[in-house]
Protein backbone atom coordinates (compact mmCIF):
# COMPACT_ATOMS: atom_id res chain seq x y z
CA UNK A 1 0.00 0.00 0.00
CA UNK A 2 2.84 2.36 0.91
CA UNK A 3 4.59 1.62 -2.41
CA UNK A 4 1.33 2.22 -4.28
CA UNK A 5 0.86 5.58 -2.54
CA UNK A 6 4.45 6.59 -3.42
CA UNK A 7 3.80 5.86 -7.10
CA UNK A 8 0.57 7.88 -6.98
CA UNK A 9 2.42 10.82 -5.38
CA UNK A 10 5.15 10.71 -8.03
CA UNK A 11 2.56 10.65 -10.81
CA UNK A 12 0.68 13.53 -9.19
CA UNK A 13 3.85 15.61 -8.91
CA UNK A 14 4.73 14.87 -12.55
CA UNK A 15 1.24 15.95 -13.60
CA UNK A 16 1.62 19.24 -11.71
CA UNK A 17 5.07 19.91 -13.16
CA UNK A 18 4.35 19.03 -16.79
CA UNK A 19 2.28 22.15 -17.61
CA UNK A 20 5.14 24.32 -16.30
CA UNK A 21 7.67 22.54 -18.50
CA UNK A 22 5.34 22.65 -21.49
CA UNK A 23 4.94 26.40 -21.07
CA UNK A 24 8.61 27.26 -20.52
CA UNK A 25 8.64 28.79 -24.00
CA UNK A 26 5.81 30.24 -26.04
CA UNK A 27 5.84 31.43 -29.65
CA UNK A 28 4.13 34.82 -29.37
CA UNK A 29 4.21 35.81 -33.04
CA UNK A 30 5.17 34.42 -36.44
CA UNK A 31 5.29 36.76 -39.44
CA UNK A 32 6.11 36.09 -43.07
CA UNK A 33 8.80 38.52 -44.27
CA UNK A 34 8.95 40.20 -47.68
CA UNK A 35 5.84 38.40 -48.90
CA UNK A 36 5.00 39.51 -52.42
CA UNK A 37 8.19 41.61 -52.53
CA UNK A 38 10.96 39.02 -52.78
CA UNK A 39 11.04 35.55 -54.26
CA UNK A 40 12.68 32.61 -52.49
CA UNK A 41 15.30 33.73 -49.94
CA UNK A 42 18.03 31.67 -48.30
CA UNK A 43 20.97 31.93 -45.84
CA UNK A 44 19.41 34.59 -43.56
CA UNK A 45 21.73 36.43 -41.15
CA UNK A 46 20.53 38.97 -38.57
CA UNK A 47 22.80 41.60 -37.08
CA UNK A 48 23.13 41.68 -33.29
CA UNK A 49 20.51 44.43 -32.94
CA UNK A 50 18.03 42.49 -35.08
CA UNK A 51 17.20 45.50 -37.26
CA UNK A 52 18.98 44.36 -40.43
CA UNK A 53 18.86 41.06 -42.29
CA UNK A 54 21.14 39.59 -44.93
CA UNK A 55 19.80 36.94 -47.30
CA UNK A 56 20.45 35.42 -50.72
CA UNK A 57 17.79 35.69 -53.39
CA UNK A 58 16.85 32.88 -55.74
CA UNK A 59 19.27 34.13 -58.40
CA UNK A 60 22.07 34.26 -55.82
CA UNK A 61 22.29 38.01 -55.20
CA UNK A 62 23.22 38.99 -51.64
CA UNK A 63 20.64 41.44 -50.30
CA UNK A 64 20.22 43.57 -47.18
CA UNK A 65 16.80 44.21 -45.63
CA UNK A 66 16.29 47.13 -43.23
CA UNK A 67 13.37 46.42 -40.87
CA UNK A 68 12.87 50.06 -39.85
CA UNK A 69 12.75 51.48 -43.38
CA UNK A 70 11.24 48.33 -44.94
CA UNK A 71 13.78 48.66 -47.75
CA UNK A 72 15.87 46.00 -49.49
CA UNK A 73 19.23 46.81 -51.12
CA UNK A 74 21.49 44.66 -53.29
CA UNK A 75 24.93 44.18 -51.74
CA UNK A 76 26.35 42.15 -54.64
CA UNK A 77 25.02 39.97 -57.43
CA UNK A 78 27.75 37.38 -57.02
CA UNK A 79 25.91 34.02 -56.74
CA UNK A 80 27.94 32.61 -53.82
CA UNK A 81 28.44 35.72 -51.68
CA UNK A 82 25.55 34.94 -49.34
CA UNK A 83 26.79 31.52 -48.26
CA UNK A 84 29.01 32.85 -45.45
CA UNK A 85 28.33 36.59 -45.35
CA UNK A 86 28.33 38.20 -41.90
CA UNK A 87 27.87 41.46 -40.03
CA UNK A 88 30.96 42.88 -38.37
CA UNK A 89 30.83 44.73 -35.07
CA UNK A 90 31.46 47.94 -37.02
CA UNK A 91 28.13 47.53 -38.82
CA UNK A 92 29.73 46.62 -42.14
CA UNK A 93 28.99 43.45 -44.09
CA UNK A 94 31.82 41.05 -44.88
CA UNK A 95 31.49 38.60 -47.75
CA UNK A 96 33.47 36.57 -50.29
CA UNK A 97 32.94 36.42 -54.06
CA UNK A 98 34.10 33.70 -56.42
CA UNK A 99 35.46 33.87 -59.97
CA UNK A 100 37.02 31.46 -62.46
CA UNK A 101 40.39 32.63 -63.78
CA UNK A 102 41.87 32.30 -67.24
CA UNK A 103 43.68 29.22 -65.96
CA UNK A 104 40.26 27.66 -65.15
CA UNK A 105 41.02 27.74 -61.42
CA UNK A 106 38.59 29.19 -58.88
CA UNK A 107 39.65 32.40 -57.13
CA UNK A 108 37.96 34.02 -54.13
CA UNK A 109 38.03 37.67 -53.11
CA UNK A 110 37.08 39.26 -49.79
CA UNK A 111 34.97 42.42 -49.62
CA UNK A 112 33.12 44.61 -47.15
CA UNK A 113 29.96 46.66 -47.73
CA UNK A 114 29.09 49.91 -45.95
CA UNK A 115 25.30 50.11 -45.64
CA UNK A 116 25.36 53.88 -45.08
CA UNK A 117 27.34 54.79 -48.20
CA UNK A 118 26.31 51.63 -50.10
CA UNK A 119 29.92 51.25 -51.19
CA UNK A 120 31.79 47.97 -51.59
CA UNK A 121 35.49 47.85 -50.71
CA UNK A 122 37.72 45.03 -51.88
CA UNK A 123 39.77 43.73 -48.96
CA UNK A 124 41.88 41.08 -50.69
CA UNK A 125 43.29 40.21 -54.05
CA UNK A 126 41.79 37.12 -55.75
CA UNK A 127 43.09 34.05 -53.93
CA UNK A 128 43.12 30.44 -55.15
CA UNK A 129 41.83 28.50 -52.17
CA UNK A 130 39.40 29.04 -49.34
CA UNK A 131 38.74 32.56 -48.10
CA UNK A 132 36.54 33.01 -45.03
CA UNK A 133 34.85 36.16 -43.73
CA UNK A 134 35.27 36.46 -39.95
CA UNK A 135 33.10 38.76 -37.82
CA UNK A 136 34.30 40.19 -34.52
CA UNK A 137 32.91 42.63 -31.97
CA UNK A 138 34.95 45.45 -33.52
CA UNK A 139 34.72 44.67 -37.22
CA UNK A 140 35.74 41.85 -39.50
CA UNK A 141 38.61 40.23 -41.37
CA UNK A 142 39.35 37.70 -44.10
CA UNK A 143 41.04 34.40 -43.39
CA UNK A 144 42.65 31.84 -45.70
CA UNK A 145 42.50 28.53 -43.77
CA UNK A 146 44.64 25.51 -44.52
CA UNK A 147 48.19 25.56 -45.79
CA UNK A 148 48.04 29.28 -46.53
CA UNK A 149 46.75 30.00 -43.00
CA UNK A 150 46.80 33.79 -42.93
CA UNK A 151 44.76 36.91 -42.28
CA UNK A 152 44.60 39.88 -44.63
CA UNK A 153 43.64 42.18 -41.77
CA UNK A 154 44.50 42.00 -38.10
CA UNK A 155 41.67 40.48 -36.10
CA UNK A 156 40.57 42.96 -33.45
CA UNK A 157 37.89 42.49 -30.84
CA UNK A 158 36.35 39.17 -29.89
CA UNK A 159 34.99 36.48 -32.20
CA UNK A 160 34.90 32.79 -33.07
CA UNK A 161 35.18 30.80 -36.29
CA UNK A 162 36.06 27.31 -37.47
CA UNK A 163 38.76 26.00 -39.79
CA UNK A 164 38.61 22.26 -40.41
CA UNK A 165 38.55 20.45 -37.07
CA UNK A 166 39.69 23.50 -35.13
CA UNK A 167 37.73 26.28 -33.51
CA UNK A 168 39.47 29.65 -33.32
CA UNK A 169 38.56 32.10 -30.56
CA UNK A 170 39.82 35.69 -30.55
CA UNK A 171 39.73 37.43 -27.18
CA UNK A 172 41.17 40.91 -26.77
CA UNK A 173 43.44 40.47 -29.78
CA UNK A 174 44.71 37.06 -28.63
CA UNK A 175 43.85 34.13 -30.89
CA UNK A 176 43.32 30.73 -29.29
CA UNK A 177 42.91 27.47 -31.21
CA UNK A 178 41.13 24.40 -29.82
CA UNK A 179 40.11 20.91 -30.93
CA UNK A 180 37.97 19.90 -27.95
CA UNK A 181 36.14 16.95 -29.56
CA UNK A 182 36.95 14.44 -32.28
CA UNK A 183 35.05 14.97 -35.51
CA UNK A 184 35.34 12.94 -38.68
CA UNK A 185 34.42 15.88 -40.94
CA UNK A 186 35.38 18.97 -38.93
CA UNK A 187 33.58 21.86 -37.28
CA UNK A 188 31.13 24.48 -38.56
CA UNK A 189 29.04 27.47 -37.42
CA UNK A 190 31.00 28.81 -34.46
CA UNK A 191 29.68 31.82 -32.56
CA UNK A 192 30.51 33.66 -29.37
CA UNK A 193 27.88 34.11 -26.67
CA UNK A 194 26.68 37.72 -26.17
CA UNK A 195 28.61 37.99 -22.90
CA UNK A 196 31.74 36.70 -24.63
CA UNK A 197 32.26 33.83 -22.18
CA UNK A 198 31.37 30.74 -24.26
CA UNK A 199 31.53 29.48 -27.83
CA UNK A 200 29.01 27.20 -29.52
CA UNK A 201 29.80 25.27 -32.69
CA UNK A 202 28.75 22.18 -34.64
CA UNK A 203 31.03 19.13 -34.78
CA UNK A 204 30.19 16.49 -37.39
CA UNK A 205 29.13 13.29 -35.68
CA UNK A 206 28.79 15.00 -32.28
CA UNK A 207 26.27 17.80 -32.77
CA UNK A 208 26.39 21.16 -31.02
CA UNK A 209 29.25 21.69 -28.56
CA UNK A 210 29.62 24.54 -26.06
CA UNK A 211 33.09 25.38 -24.74
CA UNK A 212 34.55 28.03 -22.47
CA UNK A 213 37.37 30.38 -23.46
CA UNK A 214 39.96 27.79 -22.37
CA UNK A 215 38.58 25.24 -24.82
CA UNK A 216 36.96 23.09 -22.13
CA UNK A 217 33.65 21.45 -23.07
CA UNK A 218 30.87 22.73 -20.81
CA UNK A 219 27.89 21.16 -22.61
CA UNK A 220 26.94 18.83 -25.45
CA UNK A 221 23.54 19.93 -26.72
CA UNK A 222 22.68 17.07 -29.05
CA UNK A 223 22.55 16.29 -32.74
CA UNK A 224 21.40 19.67 -34.03
CA UNK A 225 22.90 22.06 -36.57
CA UNK A 226 23.46 25.78 -37.18
CA UNK A 227 23.53 27.03 -33.57
CA UNK A 228 22.85 30.70 -32.93
CA UNK A 229 22.89 32.41 -29.52
CA UNK A 230 19.44 33.76 -28.62
CA UNK A 231 20.84 35.19 -25.38
CA UNK A 232 23.46 34.10 -22.85
CA UNK A 233 21.34 31.18 -21.64
CA UNK A 234 19.66 29.83 -24.78
CA UNK A 235 20.55 28.92 -28.34
CA UNK A 236 18.40 28.37 -31.39
CA UNK A 237 19.31 25.57 -33.79
CA UNK A 238 18.10 23.52 -36.75
CA UNK A 239 17.06 19.87 -36.42
CA UNK A 240 16.87 18.23 -39.85
CA UNK A 241 16.55 14.65 -41.05
CA UNK A 242 17.17 13.22 -44.51
CA UNK A 243 17.00 9.97 -46.45
CA UNK A 244 20.46 10.31 -47.94
CA UNK A 245 19.17 12.25 -50.94
CA UNK A 246 16.91 15.00 -49.63
CA UNK A 247 15.54 16.50 -46.43
CA UNK A 248 12.59 14.62 -44.96
CA UNK A 249 11.97 17.01 -42.06
CA UNK A 250 13.41 20.18 -40.57
CA UNK A 251 12.43 22.33 -37.62
CA UNK A 252 13.74 25.05 -35.31
CA UNK A 253 14.71 24.15 -31.73
CA UNK A 254 15.37 26.17 -28.59
CA UNK A 255 18.21 24.72 -26.50
CA UNK A 256 19.35 25.70 -23.04
CA UNK A 257 23.09 26.39 -23.19
CA UNK A 258 23.87 24.06 -20.28
CA UNK A 259 22.20 21.14 -22.05
CA UNK A 260 19.47 20.73 -19.43
CA UNK A 261 16.44 21.55 -21.57
CA UNK A 262 15.17 21.80 -25.16
CA UNK A 263 11.91 22.63 -26.94
CA UNK A 264 10.49 22.56 -30.45
CA UNK A 265 9.57 25.99 -31.83
CA UNK A 266 7.71 24.50 -34.81
CA UNK A 267 6.91 21.09 -36.25
CA UNK A 268 9.28 18.81 -38.20
CA UNK A 269 6.89 19.13 -41.17
CA UNK A 270 7.42 22.91 -41.31
CA UNK A 271 10.72 22.31 -43.16
CA UNK A 272 12.12 25.33 -41.31
CA UNK A 273 15.88 25.74 -41.48
CA UNK A 274 18.88 28.03 -41.13
CA UNK A 275 17.84 30.03 -38.03
CA UNK A 276 19.48 33.32 -37.10
CA UNK A 277 19.01 35.44 -33.96
CA UNK A 278 19.40 39.09 -33.02
CA UNK A 279 17.67 41.72 -30.94
CA UNK A 280 15.31 39.22 -29.36
CA UNK A 281 13.95 37.93 -32.65
CA UNK A 282 14.46 34.74 -34.65
CA UNK A 283 14.43 34.62 -38.44
CA UNK A 284 14.53 31.43 -40.48
CA UNK A 285 13.81 30.26 -43.99
CA UNK A 286 12.05 27.15 -45.30
CA UNK A 287 13.07 24.62 -47.90
CA UNK A 288 10.98 26.65 -50.37
CA UNK A 289 12.76 29.90 -49.47
CA UNK A 290 10.01 31.51 -47.38
CA UNK A 291 11.38 33.89 -44.73
CA UNK A 292 9.71 34.06 -41.29
CA UNK A 293 10.25 36.26 -38.26
CA UNK A 294 9.47 34.61 -34.92
CA UNK A 295 9.17 36.07 -31.43
CA UNK A 296 9.14 33.92 -28.31
CA UNK A 297 8.58 34.31 -24.59
CA UNK A 298 10.75 32.19 -22.31
CA UNK A 299 9.35 31.58 -18.82
CA UNK A 300 12.41 31.50 -16.57
PLM segments and residue spans:
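Bacterial N-terminal signal peptides that target proteins for export
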Residues: 1-8
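Bacterial N-terminal signal peptides
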Residues: 8-16
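Sequence signature of WD/YWTD-type beta-propeller architectures
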Residues: 22-300
